[in-house]
Amino acid sequence: MNRVPKGVKKLNFLFEIGLEELPSRYVDEAESNLKKIAEKELKEERIAFSEIESFSTPRRVAIIVKDIAEKQADLDKKSVGPSVEIAYKDGALTKAGEGFIKSQGATPDDVKIIENEKGKYISIEKFIAGKPTKEVLPEILSNVIKKIEFEKSMKWSDRTFRFARPIKWFVTLLGTEVLPFEFEGLKGGNKTRGMRYFAPQDVEISTPDEYVSKLRENSVIARKADRKAEILKSIKENCENDGDVAIINNYLLEEVVNLVEYPFAIKGEFNPDYLDLPEDIITITMETHQRYFPVKDANGRLTNKFIVIRNAPKYSEVVKKGNEKVIEPRLADAKFFFDEDLKGKFADNVEKLKEVTFQKDMGTIYEKMQRSKKI
């Protein structure tokens, strides 16, 4: 919280970075870092605001800075220089004294002598009037973008800048006015974009306050919490008519919520013959490889049904059948390897551990096992 002084005009400021699809694991980090870095930069530049709300989807990260002051706070700055003994010699300024005064953009007449427990020092006191926020924000935004880091980043086109994925657009809206801004050849504006496949057109934003609603009208749910709630609601609606219950793996849920902009749950089925496999093999195959939510019946038994989350605002029979088709070979592979494992004795697998590296320069899993036996 950085309160705006009374009498200072306040506006809301929207900043959105539009991207090619981010990996799911980067989305939360990008949103968090954007908010955290922006907050730090604004405070350092003495720009007051009430709060910052952040947003993210695979194709965008954004913040709305609420009640941002129209200008920087004024600053009374005191800079302490060298000691009097170093700054003066025989009543005249030394090079050290002149250098300090020059570095402060001051004149010898501005020098004051202060005294503390260490002795006497020269100092310069300056009044720095706050600049209009719209003049300071462009540099702040550039710094914010440069300071957002990722585990892996990339260059694209002829850009020298690196980011997790190519940046495609910026929204820079201060109140109802577009803030002039340019970074790596991309200019800020008041147009965002809807969902790539169902609302790919530009979406004009008139004020930051309508950002969330305008995106929703164009098949984008900007808040992660809202997408998660929509996923859980849609899954429940798909299951309750049959008395089924989906298995909600929280790690999978966190991944899926950042894979979609407008989630829609679809229930599919696979060949019930695969239910002869151990339950863990079926669920791991669905969750890890396909990002499906397995489904159990009212008695807690695993069924041949699954829930897939589509990135779309409506149902599609084609998508349902496509996912039903894809899961079959996955389960067939799982069954094949399971059956192969059953053909040999369990003890035979010990020898195979000699072929599996534990860590570089630390031998095999078999050698690790032998070391553990000695402990």
Task: Tell me what each language-model feature is.
Residues 4, 8-275, 280-282:
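Long, basic N-terminal domains or extensions that often function
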Residues 9-11, 49-50, 170, 348-349, ...:
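Non-catalytic regulatory/linker segments of enzymes
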Residues 35, 39, 328, 372-373:
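Structural signal for well-ordered, non-membrane alpha-helices
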Residues 168, 247-360, 364-370:
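Catalytic nucleotidyl-transfer cores of nucleotide-processing enzymes
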Residues 234-238, 352, 374-375:
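A general alpha-helix detector
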